[in-house]
Amino acid sequence: MSKKSEVKLREKLGFLAFSTSTNIVFNFKNLYYLIFLTNVLKIPVGTAGTMLTIGTIWDAINDPLIALFTANHTFKNGEKVRPFALYCCIPWAITIILLFTNFHLGGNLAAIAGVAIYFVFEALYTFLCMPYNSLAALTSKDDMDRKSINAYRSLGGCLGSGIGSVLVPVIVKMFGGLKGENAIIGEGDSIPLFLTACTMGALCIVGSLIHYFTSKERVKQESDNEDKIGLFEAYRMLFSCKSWVLNMFYIICYGISTALVMNSINYYAAYIMGSSAAATPILACYLVMAVVTSILTPMIDEKIGRRKTMVIAGLALIVGKIPFIFAPYSPFGIYFNALTMGFGATVTFVMFNTNRNNIADILEYQNDRRIDSLVAGGDNLVSKLAEAGALSLMTSMMASAGFDESLGLGQTAETIKTIISLLGVIPMAVAVVTVTVAFFINTKKELEESKQKASLTK
């Protein structure tokens, strides 16, 4: 029996459920937490940006540390990562509720409490994402299985985006928020956002449990080497792999681009289109394209090859920004931007995760150790530091431009220009780098070379 037949639809749907639940929180937090800090808690945008930057730096630092712990730890049932989905889902759901809780502290106390909660949230998120980032490689060694699993993960991400962003205004309104025809998120939305976060937390728990009870770790390390790995040794192994280094830069570009766009879209909707709810149809457009692309990506990859697929995705991200740059107030510009972002970002997500799965195999051939958790945890350190820099750039640009929540729709002309650049010129420049890096990635070639070298030494 082929390995491919081992991964049934039920298991892939479990990946989809888990990806949906985690992306609910990720996208809900990405889209609404910054504006919650500035418009509900009344924290200055510069301070709020610093909070997110500190939190993201902490998230970047804890990634390789937690990944190293995971690589050196085995659960009593012999598994490496799957049980984290069971043990961490409830604590993580609680932290997302706390993130959107208004404790009415005011001033510096609100900022300090926010950072503390954010630290716990990010640490638990890292533990919970061990299955999310590593289990595809541990479920099967078949490349088609892995691409299919990553496509289901991407599809789950789209559904998570739908629940966490497109449907959020509806849920907030259901709980009594966003009142008025052109409502902008404000202090009166504190309780509705809190109740929405409770709903999101419950959905996350359900998705994580579904994934835990439907998945299985099948791929085991071939050698019996169980020596503990130190942090420096882990990074020596990672940086010796050319594919890991290039894929790290590929992921950095993806993270910066999505962080800028997802954190800027609500400001564009609120202060350029006149209503926070205007983000809903734009995100729906992005979501539909992402869903279709998730289904098609494995077939595109199989037809034209991984490198061409990655390059085409990057080119789509570049082309999609051109109409928006020249006509930023045009509905066509913003919707075409959303469509191409849905295609390009989704293909990039599936590709870099499939690359990660191959890289885990490459490293095993090179070092006689499977370090699946470190493949993702290692590159997350640098990519999240880059995202932190992107968020810091965004908020400092807005603060310098004179953004002031109390001005409502009367923001300065410089603020409007800044918001437009965060959705246009800046992510376009990042996409140029994405295409350049994608052109040089060839994981299949390095995998075959490493496999041949390993066979000669045995």
Which residues fall in each region the model found?
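Membrane-embedded alpha-helical bundles of multi-pass transporters/translocases
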Residues: 2-458
